[in-house]
Amino acid sequence: LSSTATSVTVTNNGYYTFLLTAGDVTVSETVQVEKIDREAPTASVGELTSGTVESPKSGVYTKIVLPITYADAHSGVKTVQYSWTNSTVTPTSWSTLRTGAKTVAYTATESVLTTKYLHIKVFDNLSHTCTAYSQAYTVISQTAVENHAPTITIEGAPTAWTNDMATLTWRLSNYTGKNYEVILPDGKTSIEPNGQVWARQNGDYTVTVRDLDYGGKNSATIKVDKLDFDPPTVTVSGGSNSWSKDDQVITITASDSQSGVGEKWYKAVSNTEEIPTEGLTKLTGNTITVSDEGKYYIYYKIYDNA
């Protein structure tokens, strides 16, 4: 340095010793410089950590939680910002993390599969910056997962009594391009978008469509209560095996616990071998009066409402 110099410029931190010589006298002075910061902070984004929620489909997440690390060896970290985007391009819009944050979380709102990246930007106290971003993750909202399953309907329950089995028809909607299976009332499965099942007894019939991608499911149930395969119950009373000078009154009592008793027909016949197909009389009450002389058998035919 010249004898008239009053300052010196240094570019690095460290100890600097100055010697002043005047004749035979030498004076030394050491100065420490420690506030020079020319380096950017460091930052990195780790892999998925606790709190991450994976959908039933492997590699697709409804929530992701990523660990972050950052440091600055000199002036120190002042601010950490983050941004979730769909690409590796450095974002223009950022949010500020709370001081000391070690993780960043994202809960998906997307209705379709979407690629997400976490970007972080670290500032030191001299406004040097460092950016880093995560690997790509595929996300979809929990609502979309639940709603991804096709919808299903079932119809065809009889509205009037019948003595035949009922044909029930089920149909899917919103199924195009989806991976699903339909679980039928008997436990069998189908991958068709529609089909039929047969109801052979009264009861509830449920069909379920299960989404094989995300595990959601929808069901439809129909109540069948108009099947009647059982004949009415009939009891006959009255009449006598002995000769009588009076009219004979026969009482026919019918009941049916399902569709109910329908039409009742009868005919007085002279022997039990005759099964009449014509000439039957409709019975409007419960009693039949036989007035003619002779020996008769009452042939009756009772219907239910099925």
Which ranges hold each PLM region?
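Low-complexity, disordered linker/stalk regions enriched in Pro/Thr/Ser/Gly
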Residues: L1-A306
